[in-house]
């Protein structure tokens, strides 16, 4: 059935139901359409609530929906919507007073989701602060701008952009989400682009390490423009194809959120899964070569394994392998669901923080460059203080003035 025809039938049913309600409850006659002012027509919102014909300036209340998204709501509470002075309905409907009726299991899950959301906010905030600090360090310390650190810098940039757009998505309220606004779809598209670029820069990190360690190929022959193309340009056609698919096949809910059976999201999730699998192969080869070199050394076996484990743990967030630990929901039982919720929230929100710590704050080149800057600043400050004191103290016969030193030097 045509969507416009279906909507017309629903609105007609809405009008009939409201007319019956008015007659039964004795609400009186609806506003006179021939009156001096325009009025708001009977309409049906995106959630399915019927709003009756109302006078301009009226704040209309309707019972909360009985069911929405499979959740039962308390119908004794009301939703509110304003009929504007120009005879049109306000775009925003106030459903804030509608409360779900939850059983014990749903209440438990609701509590866990709330805690997970707090972990997400905390992790993203901590990550953004650490990432911005790391970004500024790479920006200021020009002496360390080799290809490896430029790759780290770009990866950190994608984390910053991804986290900022994540915060923007959290600001979208339910009405805008259900209304499928254009700007809302644009924010979702930009967010998904930064998600894909983030994973592709993890892939670039893996390519660089695999080339340098496993293939023993000189990194001097690697070209920066090629990595920039992989990290920033290849995700563009992927996201464009996804946006076209969403526009024609799943144009709803701001293009955010995935229902079972929706395949359009795999247009960008497929390449992400592919680069994660390739990075997993890179990690396996890197650790294998590392173990081979450690066995050839004279260190004890315990120290060898400790170094290998340490290197593996450091590489996990850089290559995005942590996402593979809980990429798929493990099951329907309570324990699996709770573990899935908390691990996903922690790993995804704090990954930017771990990347900043391991590859900037613990980076030997960064720390050495910072120490040199600090020593130069101390030396410069130490030289300026005695000179300022010498120029401010009056000279005496027993004290050699700064002016006399200059004259002696001139002679």
Swiss-Prot record:
Task: Name the Pfam families for this protein.
Answer: 7tm_2, HRM
Q: Which residues cross the membrane?
A: 109-139, 147-171, 186-214, 222-249, 266-291, 303-327, 335-364
User: What InterPro entries does this protein's entry cite?
Assistant: GPCR_2, GPCR_2-like_7TM, GPCR_2_CRF2_rcpt, GPCR_2_CRF_rcpt, GPCR_2_extracell_dom_sf, GPCR_2_extracellular_dom, GPCR_2_secretin-like, GPCR_2_secretin-like_CS
The residues exposed to the Extracellular compartment are 1-108, 172-185, 250-265, 328-334
* Glycosylation site positions: 13, 41, 74, 86, 94
* SMART domains for this protein: HormR
User: What is known about its processing and modification?
Assistant: A N-glycosylation site within the signal peptide impedes its proper cleavage and function.
Question: Where can this protein be found?
Answer: Cell membrane
Q: Does the keyword Transcription regulation apply?
A: no
Quaternary organization? Monomer. Interacts (via N-terminal extracellular domain) with CRF, UCN, UCN2 and UCN3.
**Which PANTHER family did the record assign?**
CORTICOTROPIN-RELEASING FACTOR RECEPTOR 2, PDF RECEPTOR-LIKE PROTEIN-RELATED
Q: What is this protein called?
A: Corticotropin-releasing factor receptor 2
Lineage, broadest ranks: Eukaryota, Metazoa, Chordata, Craniata, Vertebrata
């Amino acid at each position: 059935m045509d969507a416009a025809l279906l909507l017309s039938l629903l609105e007609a049913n809405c009008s009939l139901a409201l007319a019956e309600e008015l007659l039964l409850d004795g609400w009186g006659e609806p506003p006179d359409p021939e009156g001096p002012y325009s009025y708001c027509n009977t309409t049906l919102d995106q959630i399915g609530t019927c709003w009756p014909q109302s006078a301009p300036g009226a704040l209309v209340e309707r019972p909360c929906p009985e069911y929405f998204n499979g959740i039962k709501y308390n119908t004794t509470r009301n939703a509110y919507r304003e009929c504007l002075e120009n005879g049109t309905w306000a775009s925003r409907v106030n459903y804030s007073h509608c409360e779900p009726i939850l059983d014990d299991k749903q209440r438990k899950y609701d509590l866990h989701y709330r805690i997970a959301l707090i972990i997400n906010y905390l992790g993203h905030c901590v990550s953004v602060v650490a990432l911005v600090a790391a970004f500024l360090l790479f920006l200021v310390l020009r002496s360390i701008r080799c290809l490896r650190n430029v790759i780290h810098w770009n990866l950190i940039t994608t984390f910053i952009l991804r986290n900022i757009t994540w915060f923007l998505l959290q600001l979208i309220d339910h009405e805008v989400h259900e209304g499928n606004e254009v700007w809302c779809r644009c924010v979702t598209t930009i967010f998904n682009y930064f998600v894909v670029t983030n994973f592709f820069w993890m892939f670039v990190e893996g390519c660089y390490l695999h080339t340098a360690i496993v293939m023993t190929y000189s990194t001097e022959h690697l070209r920066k423009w090629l990595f920039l193309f992989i990290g920033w340009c290849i995700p563009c056609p992927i996201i464009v194809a996804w946006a076209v698919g969403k526009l024609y096949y799943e144009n709803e809910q701001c293009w955010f959120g995935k229902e079972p059976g929706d395949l359009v999201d795999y247009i960008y999730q497929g390449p992400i899964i592919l680069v994660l699998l390739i990075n997993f192969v890179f990690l396996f080869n890197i650790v294998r070569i590392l173990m081979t070199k450690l066995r050839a050394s004279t260190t004890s076996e315990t120290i060898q394994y400790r170094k290998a484990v340490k290197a593996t743990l450091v590489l996990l967030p850089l290559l995005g392998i942590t996402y593979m630990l809980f990429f798929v929901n493990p099951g329907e039982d309570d324990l699996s669901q709770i573990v899935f919720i908390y691990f996903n929230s922690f790993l995804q929100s704090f990954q930017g923080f771990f990347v900043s710590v391991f590859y900037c704050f613990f980076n030997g080149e960064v720390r050495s460059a910072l120490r040199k800057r600090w020593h130069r600043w101390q030396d410069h400050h130490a030289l300026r203080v005695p000179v300022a004191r010498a120029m401010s103290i009056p000279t005496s016969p027993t004290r050699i003035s700064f002016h006399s030193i200059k004259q002696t030097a001139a002679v």
